[in-house]
Amino acid sequence: MKWINHIAIAGATTAIVAPTLVPVAVAGCTAPDWLEWLYKFVTGNKIRHRGATHYLSAWVLGLVFCLTLYDFHHIGAAFFYGGLTHIMADSFTVMGVPLSPWSDTRFHLFGGRLRTGESGEYLISWGIVGICILVGSFFSSYGGWYPFFYDWAGYYESGMIDASEWKANRFRLI
């Protein structure tokens, strides 16, 4: 899958649970690919794409480890969750992802019918984003706290800001 789709899936699914952890999950969702580049930079050896950095078992174990032991503000869990969303999204593709370093079996979801860059990839990822928007709007009340999207009209109505500040920021999303 393309990075934009990995970022969309990890960001949307994380925003429902913990909006403040979206940047960490986005860093984690791109990690399986940039870890390949980092390994090559550090050691000089190239590893195969969707190889050692794409082991499903490693990302699941990392997430379980962070969820069961002390994790400072769930930063580690968000990072490994982002990586796990990357692995799960790559499992939709024809190539699939390896289960573990000791297994030759590749993991596929829904038969692994997607090809990277084709329309099916975008339909699935943006469908997940749409579902997350619906779920998020259903479970959150109006005026809830979203750290990256400010409710300027609500702030003005409650008297928190004055009219000039509202006019200056009313069309600002972030």
Segments predicted by a language model, with ranges:
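N-terminal membrane-targeting hydrophobic helices
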Residues: 1-174
